[in-house]
A protein has these predicted regions:
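Short acidic-glycine-tyrosine-enriched beta hairpin
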Residues: 38, 68-86
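Ligand-binding loop in jelly-roll beta-barrel domains
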Residues: 70, 85-115
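Short, charged, solvent-exposed linker or helix-capping segments at domain edges/interfaces
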Residues: 116-121
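Single conserved hydrophobic/aromatic residue that forms the stacking wall/gate
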Residues: 1-8, 12
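Glycine- and acidic-residue-biased ligand/ion/polar-headgroup-sensing regions
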Residues: 51-69
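Histidine-centered metal-chelating micro-motifs
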Residues: 43-45, 64, 80, 84-96
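A short glycine-rich, His/Asp/Glu-containing loop-to-beta-strand
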Residues: 13-46, 107
Length: 121
């Protein structure tokens, strides 16, 4: 089941959100730029992005992703790319980062007026 208004998605949307901007790119496309700061977050709820792709840049701290097929830790000035429609979040095998904090810049391009993040119940 796909949902954009579940309790988990509402918490995630607010959790750590410092800023969120949308830029009209023309041609029916928008660029979404979010800045998120979190500590001891663990994993996020299961979701995917029906977008042209997502770039996650670590401004400060440490984060992790399985976008390469295996878990990798990223720190200051490192980034990873998430392919369109890649389902992630809620992984039972996610390494525990403990009390680690992260300051992330998330950049994604999506069709204008469409949800750029879809949560899976």
């Amino acid at each position: 089941t796909h949902s954009t208004s579940s309790a988990a998605s509402d918490v995630y949307k607010r959790q750590g959100m410092v800023s969120s901007d949308v830029f009209d790119m023309g041609g029916g496309m928008e660029m979404h730029v979010e800045r998120r700061k979190t500590c001891n977050q663990g994993t996020v709820p299961k979701h995917f992005h029906p977008a042209a792709g997502t770039l996650v840049y670590v401004l400060d701290g440490v984060s992790q992703s399985k976008s390469s097929g295996k878990w990798k830790k990223y720190s200051n000035n490192e980034y990873w790319f998430e392919k369109s429609d890649w389902v992630h979040g809620g992984e039972a095998d996610a390494p525990d980062l403990g009390e680690a904090c992260s300051d992330l810049l998330v950049i994604r391009v999506a069709e204008s007026g469409k949800d750029h993040t879809v949560f899976i119940d």
